[in-house]
Structures are given as C-alpha cells and as structure tokens.
Regions:
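Active-site-adjacent beta->alpha loops and helix N-cap segments on the catalytic face
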Residues: 133-146
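A charged N-terminal "starter" segment
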Residues: 1-129, 143-144, 395, 403-406, ...
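Alpha-helical scaffolding segments of alpha/beta enzyme cores, especially the outer helices
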Residues: 42, 46-49, 67, 71-74, ...
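A cross-domain feature marking catalytic cores of carbohydrate-active enzymes
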Residues: 58-62, 81, 104, 129-131, ...
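Active-site loop/helix belt of alpha/beta enzymes
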Residues: 2-5, 143, 153-292
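Structural preference for beta-strand elements that scaffold enzyme active sites
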Residues: 55-57, 78, 97-101, 124-126, ...
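Conserved, mostly hydrophobic/aromatic
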Residues: 40, 61, 72, 83, ...
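Charged (often Lys/Glu-rich) extended helix/loop segments that serve as interaction or gating elements
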Residues: 269-415
Length: 415
C-alpha cells in the first residue's frame, strides 16, 4: 500500500536504493531515466491532503509520460493541459474529456481547432484563455462552452526570471482589464472561473510573495462575481516547489494549505490548484556513466554520457540538480565539474561541486529530474533520446524505449 499524506516530504538522492540503480544501469544502459511511480502517488496525495476542499489537478506539462498520467488518474487526479498534444495524451491515458482543463497560451490554430471540436462533444471541457483575442478566435470556431479567464495580477515569483510570470509577462489579462473582459466573455460563453499562475519553484521563503499574488487574484474574482455573477472556481495554478539543494527544506504542506486558503479568503467559488513539479520532480532521476576524467588547470573535469540533450534545465535556467556517485558514495569528496558530450560550454551539470571522487565507468545519479526533464529532452547532435524505466514496488518496466539512430532520421525525406 502507498504512503499518503504522511510520506517523507522530500526524497534526496541518498534515499534511492543504490544497488537497484546499479542493476538498472547495467540492464538498460545509460543515460537512463528512472521513474518511481509510488513516489508520484505519495506526492500527489500529500498535496491533495493539504487542500481537502479544493479541486487538485495535475499540470501535465511537467511530465506527460503515459505511466505518470495513468498513475495519477488511478488515484483520482484530474489533468490540466497546455497544448492539444497534452489533451490527446491525457485522453489516451484514460482521462474523461469532460474533466479536462485546457489552458491556451497564444494557441496555434490547430490547438484551438482541436479544443473547440473536443468541447463540442464534451461539454465538461473547460478552456482557459489569457487574451481577449483568444476568446474571439474561439467564438469564430463556434465554441460557446465552458471558459475561464487567465488573469495577470502583476506579481511574479519563482526560481528563475524565465519562469516567473509578472506584470510584463505574456500570460493573462492585465488586472485592470479583467472585469471588462469578463463582462464580454460572459455574454458569449459559459464563464465558470478565473485562473492565474504567477511563478514556479516556490518554497517556504517565497510564500509571502506568492500569497500576496493569491490575495490579488481572489480580489479580482470578487470583482468579476459582482459584475457577472457567481463563478464555479478560482484556479491559482501551481508553482509549488521542491528542494533541489541538499540544504533546502521542503514545503510544509499543512502550513502551505492554511496560508493559501487564508490568502484566498471567503469565496463562493471552489479553490482549484495545478501542481506539476511538486508531484513528479523528486520521483525521477537520471543515471549517467563517467567516460572521461581530465585534470584542467583550475578544475577536475568529469565527462559523462548524459548531456543538455538529456537534461536541459541546467543550461536553460542555470538550475541546480543534485549529483551523487552511486558506484562509490563513500569515497572522499573533491570539487569537480561534470559535463556532457555536446560541443557547447553550456553542456555542464555542475562546476566545482564536491562529489565522491569519480573514476571512469562510475555511475552518477542526477536528482530531481522528474519535472521538465524528459519533457525538454532533445536530439541535439543527433543523439537518440534515452530510455525511461519505471519502478513501482518490486516491478520494473520500460515505459519509453531508448531511441535509435533510425529514430533520429525517420521523419526526413529526400529533397
């Protein structure tokens, strides 16, 4: 039986079974994504327990793997999607289209076509838009069903400027325009909610700013209700983080739940949330093999077979991911820089990081790879994407096979 709300609030690399990781690497090769589905369930249940009266959806963008979606659907989660591909993947995994929420951000025509057609057959689908223009485009397609307005409260929080969504961001209707837009939208659609998402990677020290944003959005919801009538829900998005650094404490979810509900205040609308990173980040790691040790003038450089094509976040966001020597965690630590085989100086996972002294053929683990890990993986340098193996108790299964060179070129045609 799974642990639930009382499961450990954080999973460090040292908590993984190193012998099992070594066996997985030997059997399936490296680089390798290893996903723990029991941990996915634990994280979702812990989050949902902190918001017992709320509608808790999973933000599919964090990890759209079928194994993840099926696992979360099995414990009662609904799915929030940000693109037609995510809608299709959720449906393929068994989601009822009437329970889905589609959040449209500058949506391509094909995405709006798909969503409008889906809504014509499934009246429970909710489409969220953050631009008046998007509502016009939906109306042009004959859609008049359930919609929510994404608002921009003018406050952004998060672990990096590229994920904070403040007043000048591309997301949402500016606060001062919301009531006017709501009146127009309510005349043409079934307006059921207000939506906001103001950042990512929010930890305990960020709660004050995050709650100020929630207070602002809740105030806008009350303004809208005075203008057009009751709303069904107020969706405050996700953004709840996990500790990537070993000395960072995890969120105290009971406190988070209390703070968020207090910030939202008295509402007739149901509170809704969309955790993504919180659910999957520490449920997955990457195994990578050391292939090169080089003594540079100012550092020891450790070359591995994973790269920014395997995990983009360090290059894209300067993100910190914990790294551990699985082969010999007890060796004396020394500062090393770990990088992959790509021909760019951005292909570095850490610089001068103390790690148990790596040797060639050692197995390293890169932690917290479950959120925006495989989602951002690419075929840069024509590298096949890695396999993904899921574990669940004693069961192990390949849920994404390792790509081959034929997979890299299969879509190409002669000129």
């Amino acid at each position: 039986m799974d642990a639930s709300a009382d499961s450990p609030p954080v999973r460090r690399l040292a908590d993984w079974e190193h012998d099992r990781l070594g066996a997985l690497a030997d059997r399936y090769g490296t680089p390798l994504y290893v996903l723990d589905l029991a941990r996915v369930r634990e994280n979702y249940r812990r989050f949902a327990a902190a918001f017992p009266d709320a509608h808790v959806m999973y933000a599919a963008k964090a990890h759209t793997g079928r194994a993840v979606l099926e696992t979360l659907l099995s414990v009662g989660a609904d799915i929030e999607c940000a693109a037609r591909g995510e809608l299709q993947r959720a449906i393929d995994a068994g989601a009822d289209p009437d329970t889905l929420q589609y959040t449209a951000v500058n949506p391509p025509a094909a995405d709006l076509d798909y969503a409008a057609d889906l809504g014509a057959d499934h009246s429970g689908l909710t489409i969220t838009a953050g631009a008046r223009d998007t509502f016009d485009r939906l109306a042009d397609r004959g859609y008049d069903g359930r919609v929510a307005i994404r608002v921009n409260p003018g406050i952004g929080t998060g672990h990096h400027e590229k994920v904070a969504t403040g007043k000048d961001a591309k997301f949402g209707i500016p606060a001062e325009q919301v009531t006017d837009v709501a009146a127009d939208v309510a005349d043409r659609f079934e307006l059921v909610g207000l939506h906001s998402h103001v950042g990512s990677g929010v930890l305990q020290d960020d709660l004050d700013d995050h709650c100020r944003a929630i207070e602002r959005v809740a105030g806008l919801a009350r303004d809208v209700e005075r203008e057009v009538g009751d709303l069904e829900f107020l969706d405050i998005g996700g953004g709840f983080g996990v500790p990537y650094r070993e000395d960072e404490p995890p969120l105290e979810m009971e406190v988070v739940g209390e703070r968020v509900r207090a910030a939202a205040g008295e509402l007739g609308a149901q509170l809704a949330l969309e955790p993504g990173r919180y659910v999957v980040a520490d449920a997955e790691l990457i195994l990578t093999r050391v292939n090169t040790i080089k003594q540079a003038p100012s550092a020891t450089v450790v070359g591995v077979d994973a790269s920014l094509a395997t995990l983009l976040r360090p290059a894209m966001f300067e993100a910190y991911h914990p790294i551990r020597n699985v082969t010999a965690p007890g060796r004396k630590s020394e500062p090393v820089s770990v990088g992959g085989p790509c021909c760019t100086s951005a292909d570095v996972f850490c610089t001068d990081r103390p790690i148990a002294r790596p040797e060639r053929e050692d197995l390293l683990a890169i932690g917290n790879a479950g959120a925006y890990g495989y989602e951002l993986a690419s075929q840069f340098h024509s590298q096949p994407r890695p396999a993904e193996v899921a574990v669940d108790g004693g069961k192990t299964s390949v849920v994404r096979r390792r790509e081959t060179l034929d997979d890299v070129t299969h879509g190409e045609q002669e000129f």
